[in-house]
Amino acid sequence: ASTVEALGKSIVAGQYPVGTSLPPEPQLCENFGVSRTVVRESIKSLVAKGLIVTGPKLGTRVLSEDQWNWFDPDVVSWLSQKRLSADFLRDLQELRRIVEPAAIRLAAERATTRELTSIEVAFSGMKNAVENGGDYVTHDLRFHQGLLQASGNRMLVQMSKVLGALLRTSFEISTAKKNGPAESLSMHREVLDAVIAREPDRAEAAILHLIDGAKQDIDLVLSSRRRIPYIGRPATPLRAL
């Protein structure tokens, strides 16, 4: 693991409590066997991610979770390896309910032929993974990111990139439900068909149905386990039916 990854994971895991200082630079160099330059660059990266703050009188102090950059893929990945909280998943589902329906309405009005083809390819990948085994989650992510990109709104297109890690986190858990991917295929098809038909109202209703179904799957997965699943590694590929 890189120095920034090792430090980031340690902070997210609570090894350095909020308000405490990281070890001094020479100690970090010794701990990780790296140069001062590497340590300084790692510190800069963690500052950019909102995990720590530095200053002449402050030193290098750990910030509270509300200061972290929740859209940073590394931060999300480190959080998932720590085991996610129920609050995190609630916030994520609420964010999806706010962003995706509005984006889908725009996609139904603006999607180009090329964008629709890209989403269709992603759906085919999902279907193939269900029927023949394979990486369902990656195709699922491409499907949803494709819909955001098809909105024709540059800010939503940018958001599709930063939402990637968050969406993957949601999909990793919801697809852990037995037969979950197979059951959701028809809902994904309904979303895509509504967008292709240029029917914003129908598309919005379909994506809400899909998001709420994913929430039920997540709740079911969580209720059957004492702790939220560990998803530090990619989801296990599906087996053929």
Feature locations, PLM:
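Short linear motifs at protein or domain termini
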Residues: 1-98, 105, 225-228, 232, ...
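Juxtamembrane/interface motifs at transmembrane-helix termini
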Residues: 2, 40, 136-140, 176-180, ...
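Surface-exposed helix-capping loop/turn segments at secondary-structure junctions
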Residues: 17-19, 106-114, 200, 222-225
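Conserved amphipathic alpha-helical segments that form helical-bundle/coiled-coil interaction surfaces
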Residues: 92-173, 184-193, 202-217
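C-terminal effector-binding regulatory domain of bacterial HTH transcription factors
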Residues: 201-241
